[in-house]
Amino acid sequence: MVKLVFARHGESEWNKANLFTGWADVDLSEKGTQQAIDAGKLIKEAGIKFDQAYTSVLKRAIKTTNLALEASDQLWVPVEKSWRLNERHYGGLTGKNKAEAAEQFGDEQVHIWRRSYDVLPPNMDRDDEHSAHTDRRYASLDDSVIPDAENLKVTLERALPFWEDKIAPALKDGKNVFVGAHGNSIRALVKHIKGLSDDEIMDVEIPNFPPLVFEFDEKLNVVSEYYLGK
């Protein structure tokens, strides 16, 4: 059986401050750095050997991937970065305190923006300091592809081609794969892998730690699913 390990990035500075992060390139907190190292230790203890790793183009996921691979003595494993594994784009909510947003827009509205499958938050202004339209890491993309806001549905739509073109073929080739990504990009892929309904995915949470493991048969049917260390 092949294994796919999802590691959500460790706690970021904005997680710690309770801010909507999305595509903002925020660093790991001290706690988050340790979580990434501990994730690697759990991987080593479990004896999981990787052949390929994938991550987003955001530093909190990149650092988590590198720290986890280093702690599991697998820093040599090839790592491919893709914007398609980025966190969901929180649009105009980016940088806002979650509690303050609830006060401004109402608890129910913010809950809908955060947890619904297909409701978009307000768009981010193109001149916002966190806008991806002027970010060099997305310079190769057509401007029409770069989002101003995303819901989970849109997040899955842009992550799914990466699953179909990269992750799934690697697994079918018998490779164990590490994916260092984000809460919502992982949720989106979990929805696809498990065939969850739009309502079912609303209750799925992906913690910063520990890593989530899927084991597949040769046809990519899920054989088992578990969190390391639990």
Curated annotation (Swiss-Prot):
<feature type="site" description="Transition state stabilizer">
    <location>
        <position position="182"/>
    </location>
</feature>
<feature type="active site" description="Proton donor/acceptor">
    <location>
        <position position="87"/>
    </location>
</feature>
<comment type="similarity">
    <text>Belongs to the phosphoglycerate mutase family. BPG-dependent PGAM subfamily.</text>
</comment>
<feature type="binding site">
    <location>
        <begin position="87"/>
        <end position="90"/>
    </location>
    <ligand>
        <name>substrate</name>
    </ligand>
</feature>
<feature type="binding site">
    <location>
        <begin position="8"/>
        <end position="15"/>
    </location>
    <ligand>
        <name>substrate</name>
    </ligand>
</feature>
<feature type="binding site">
    <location>
        <begin position="183"/>
        <end position="184"/>
    </location>
    <ligand>
        <name>substrate</name>
    </ligand>
</feature>
<protein>
    <recommendedName>
        <fullName>2,3-bisphosphoglycerate-dependent phosphoglycerate mutase</fullName>
        <ecNumber>5.4.2.11</ecNumber>
    </recommendedName>
</protein>
<feature type="binding site">
    <location>
        <begin position="21"/>
        <end position="22"/>
    </location>
    <ligand>
        <name>substrate</name>
    </ligand>
</feature>
<dbReference type="InterPro" id="IPR029033">
    <property type="entry name" value="His_PPase_superfam"/>
</dbReference>
<dbReference type="GO" id="GO:0004619">
    <property type="term" value="F:phosphoglycerate mutase activity"/>
</dbReference>
<dbReference type="GO" id="GO:0006096">
    <property type="term" value="P:glycolytic process"/>
</dbReference>
<keyword id="KW-0413">Isomerase</keyword>
<keyword id="KW-0324">Glycolysis</keyword>
<dbReference type="InterPro" id="IPR005952">
    <property type="entry name" value="Phosphogly_mut1"/>
</dbReference>
<comment type="function">
    <text>Catalyzes the interconversion of 2-phosphoglycerate and 3-phosphoglycerate.</text>
</comment>
<feature type="binding site">
    <location>
        <position position="98"/>
    </location>
    <ligand>
        <name>substrate</name>
    </ligand>
</feature>
<dbReference type="InterPro" id="IPR013078">
    <property type="entry name" value="His_Pase_superF_clade-1"/>
</dbReference>
<dbReference type="Pfam" id="PF00300">
    <property type="entry name" value="His_Phos_1"/>
</dbReference>
<keyword id="KW-0312">Gluconeogenesis</keyword>
<feature type="binding site">
    <location>
        <begin position="114"/>
        <end position="115"/>
    </location>
    <ligand>
        <name>substrate</name>
    </ligand>
</feature>
<feature type="active site" description="Tele-phosphohistidine intermediate">
    <location>
        <position position="9"/>
    </location>
</feature>
<dbReference type="GO" id="GO:0006094">
    <property type="term" value="P:gluconeogenesis"/>
</dbReference>
<comment type="pathway">
    <text>Carbohydrate degradation; glycolysis; pyruvate from D-glyceraldehyde 3-phosphate: step 3/5.</text>
</comment>
<feature type="binding site">
    <location>
        <position position="60"/>
    </location>
    <ligand>
        <name>substrate</name>
    </ligand>
</feature>
